[in-house]
Structures are given as structure tokens and as C-alpha cells.
Amino acid sequence: MKVKYLLIGILFLSACNGRLDEMRPHNMAEADNYLSSFNNIVNATSGLYGQFQSAAGGYTEVSLYHVAYHVLGEFRANNVIFNDAFLSWSTDYLRGPDAHFFLNSDQKSQSYAWSVWAKSHQLILGASRNIVAIDKLYANTVNPDEKLNLVRLKGENAFLRGLLIFNATNVFGRPFWDQPDKNLGIPLDVEATAQALERSSVRECFEQAIADFKTAAACLPDERSDRTFANKAASFGMLSRIYLYMGGMPESPVEDYNRMAVRYADSTFSMKNDVVEVLQGEELKDLYDNPKTNKEILFAFTPANFPSRIHNLVHNYYSWYGYESSASTSGYNCVISRDYEEIMDQEKDLRWTYFTEPSGRFNGRYNTKKYNGGKYEAFSGYYSFACPVVFIRAGEVILNRAEAYMKLGESGKALADLNYIRQRAGLSPLSGISGMELFDEIFDERRRELAFEAQTYYDYVRNGRKMERKEDSVAYSSYTARQYNEIDPQTSRRTMCLIPSEEISLNKKLVQNEY
């Protein structure tokens, strides 16, 4: 039943996106009326997925959520450098360097922060409106099949809302170990009031995201599902991640939260009717090709769900598109950093073999292949890539559990999980390590495993570790000083993006981040 309704929703995706564009604080007059029918709730829920691809507030392509999510999670770390400057006409001309060098502009034309802020609030409000409408309709319907599907729809909306709240809090808030009751996250309009609200605390934001993921896990069925839609396994996986983010620095771990990270990691792999696996051997090389049926991916956004198979702009940072004859001159300018090359065993590590390739543009450099999936011929001889953006997968959940076990002092269990990921990558198991030595190995393994998936930067921040680049992006000669290429979360508040000034002018209750 779910597949049927979501396919209907996707067919009407453009109309849904337009409806969601109207469902913003300045115009909510028709929302209640529109969401009074079951079919419209189905369409509105499907439209939320479409909003990952559509521009926020009718702005340009740079405001696509999945692009901004990637840039702010990946470019601010040390796996990628710019081997060439973005062209002056490029939408990344200012936004790419703004993230990479921690310039953190509050202008929407210069930073991806506005994209995350605007799109997050649009989707959070849309999901909240849907949940309110679902609860009303559930109370008034007597059709058992419709009730069952309303429960499922509530789970999907709760998952998406939790995901957006959690991600935005990491962008605009301080890490959880730093006064979470005092430091601010984002406004939480979970009642769908569409009113200007104050920012909630980081703790309140995390607790709301947890509540949403728990609702999703309770409402979504234990069955194999299309991983490009919200599902129970992804809900458990996100709970393992968020509790890990709350689990403190390795020097001062919080036992209760780390135990919850272990609990929900276990839940991810303990469902009766859904199979979640970490891909092994030859299967590993296909990890990023088909998220719909992949047993390791828990949740991913894919442009392939759209009738037009829209090109994924994240691909453009790392590889060519267009005519194959122009592959060596195509405009992509990101390459794998020497920092990352140094931590990889390029002879033995299957992740290097399967997921990197020599750059076609820059001799002696490498690019990631994680966004080379979904290749299709848009027209004669011209190729585009409708590759997925993975938000969470089973390989991460194993490493979540390994880190949580380490912080609980259960070194044997932590080492077992760490070695599970190492051995599937073709590396030898480790033994006889514990404490900070074990933590360092887990941290580096997360970097090897999750590079180019918008995770590494937040691993540095949530663990209070200084992020340092050994190699500068020399294409930007003005930004080779250390203040542009390292950040210490324990001494610098520039880990947070600024709230866009335009949003503060619209909502006088907002308090700007201070450095």
C-alpha cells in the first residue's frame, strides 16, 4: 500500500512542491483545508522528499538541501581540498570557500547556511503540519486500512522532521558536550503554529529529534522497504548516531547516552523481517549504486525517484559530466587531500580500490567515486549522474557502536566492531589496544569509512578534537594561514554557522551566534 501511495505522490511531485512552498510562515491559510483528506496527506508527505531536491523559497540551485548538507559536512573537514578556484560565475564561487575556510558569512548569497536554515524550516513546518493533520484524520476515520496507512505516514513525517532538526542543530548549534541547556539550536515549530519563535536549546532540539525518531521507529513497519523513503531501520540507525553525539568527548564520556547508542545500533540489526547487512567482498563496490535495494544503506536521497532523473549536483564537485571527450577539462575542482591519502593503505584497502580514481583533470591527484552512480545519457553523447546522497548506512552504525563501547570502557567489544569494518575493507585486524589508542583507531576508521559522506567534520566537533589540514587549498592563496585551515571546537565557536541576517530581520526573536 505504501509503495502505491508514494508512487502517486511522486507523479504529482511538482504540484506537491508548489503546495509546500506555500506552506511557509507567511502563507498558511490553505494548509488545514488542503490536508483534510487522506490523498492530500499522501501527496504532501511525498512532496517532502522532493524538497531535498527543490530550491528553498524559489531561490537558485545552490539552495538544494542535499548539496548544502554535503558542503557543510564535508568541505569543512580535511578529506577534500580545492585544486582550482571556483569560477566567478559559479554558484559556489563564494559559498564553497565560505565553508572550507570557516569564513561563515551571514549573507545568503555567500553561504550555504541560508540554504540549510530556510529549507530545514520549510520541511520541519511541512512535516509538522502533516503530523497534526494525520492525528486529526486518524481520530475521525473508521477505515482500518486507512488508519494503518496514516500510522505509516506519521512515521515517515516524524523521521524526516527528526532528521532535519538534528542536522540543522549541528550546523547552527554547539556540540552537545558544551552547555546544551544554554547554547541555542533552532526554533522548533512542532505544533505547526507558523509563528516566529525563539531558538530552542541544543538539548531541546536533540530531545525533539530523539522523540521523532522513536515515533518513526514505532510507526514504521518491520519489513524490507525502499531505502529512499523513511523506514524503521533508518530510524534505529539515526538514534544510534544522535545518542553517540550526546555521548561526550572520549576524556569525559556520558555513560547513559553511550549505552543508548549501543542499544539502538543493536536494534538496527535485530529486526525480524528486514535484513540490514554490511556488504562484503565484491558487493562492496556497488555500495552507492542502488539505494533502493541495497542492504547496507538505511536512508538515502536519490534524484532517480524523479521522473526527469535530475542530475545530482554533488557529483559535480568530484568528477566530470557532459560529453566524455571533455572529461579532462570539465570544471570540477575538488580532489582528495594528501591528508586523507596518508591514512589509507592504497595497496590493501578495498575502499581505496573501489571508491577512488585518478583525477582526469589534475595529474597525480585522486577523486572519490562515491557520486559516480546513476549515470545516464541525457541526450546524444551527453551524460549526467542521478547518484544518491547517503544519509546513514549500516557501516556507520557498526562504528557508532564501536565508539560507544570504547567510551563505556568495553574495549573488547569495541575492537570487535572496529575489526569487522577493517576486515571487510581488506585490512588486518588490530589487537591489544584500549583507551585513547583504541579511540584514535576508531576515529581514523570512521574517517576512512565515511569520507565524502558529510560526517568527518562533525566527528571532530562532537569529540572536541582539533581539525587540522596538513595541505592547504593553494588555489586560494589568501587562505593558507592556520586560522583558515584548522579549528579547535574547545576554543573556537566558529564551529557554528551564523544565522542568515535576512532571517533575523524577519524574526526579531532570533539571537545570532557569536564568536
Map each language-model feature to its residues.
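Short coil/linker segments at helix-helix boundaries
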Residues: 141, 146-150, 171-208, 249-259
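Membrane-proximal, proline-rich intrinsically disordered regions
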Residues: 16-76, 319-325, 331, 344-347, ...
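Short, surface-exposed recognition loops and adjoining beta-strand edges that mediate ligand/DNA contacts
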Residues: 26-32, 60-73, 77, 174-182, ...
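Extended ligand-binding clefts on enzyme/binding-domain cores
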Residues: 38-41, 45, 50-63, 255-256, ...
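Conserved, well-structured interaction surfaces
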Residues: 89-172, 215-225, 382-389, 408, ...
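Sec-dependent bacterial lipoprotein signal peptides
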Residues: 1-14
